[in-house]
């Protein structure tokens, strides 16, 4: 199985424009994410996917592989889907471009799902939240899964309700690493956006 790591990076973020190029110890943030991704031995290639000339220039200056993509994409997953039309691969892993200290083992954990069960077409991660402040934080995306571990709902609000039978329910945060088999990614990219 050929596995491709993709780091979507856009300059025009509404909350923090230029975030991928913010300087961290003399290097742009995107460089640190790329270095962490390169530590994943399962990756055959790692690319930054961007629509911005400044990010492309920074990638080239720091010897990172970069692919220019459309500026019409609504999500990082759409950007990864475009990369899948330009690069041969069986599995594409979307790594958030604003996580300079992402643990490579977490990326490997997502990839391992596809080796354990060949019927899996899409995967992501969840981690239990134990800090009450993080449970309440709207900056943390929470996820509810079914008994098999399949995601049912994502929210920045507290889900599930934080009290169940008089005791606190377990709450999980979504870890923003997504992996897609090529066929699933092609179908996913054709789906229209919804309000949720």
Residue spans for each PLM region:
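Conserved core of the sugar-phosphate nucleotidyltransferase
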Residues: 104-194
């Amino acid at each position: 199985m050929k596995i491709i790591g993709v780091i979507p990076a856009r300059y025009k973020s509404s909350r923090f424009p230029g975030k991928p190029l913010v300087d961290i110890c003399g290097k742009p943030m995107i460089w640190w994410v790329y270095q962490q991704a390169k530590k994943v031995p399962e990756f055959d290639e790692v690319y930054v996917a961007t629509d911005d000339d400044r990010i492309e220039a920074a990638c080239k200056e720091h010897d990172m592989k970069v692919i220019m993509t459309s500026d019409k994409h609504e999500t990082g997953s759409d950007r990864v889907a475009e990369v899948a039309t330009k690069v041969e691969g069986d599995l594409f892993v979307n790594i958030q471009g604003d996580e300079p200290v992402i643990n490579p083992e977490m990326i490997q954990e997502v990839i391992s799902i596809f080796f354990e069960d060949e019927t899996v077409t899409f995967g992501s991660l969840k981690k239990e939240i134990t800090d009450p402040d993080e449970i309440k934080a709207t900056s943390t995306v929470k996820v509810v899964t079914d008994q098999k571990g399949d995601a049912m709902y994502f929210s920045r609000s507290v889900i599930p309700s934080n009290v169940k039978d008089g005791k606190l329910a377990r709450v999980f945060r979504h870890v923003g690493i997504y992996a897609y088999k090529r066929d699933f990614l092609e179908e996913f990219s054709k789906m229209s956006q919804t309000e949720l």
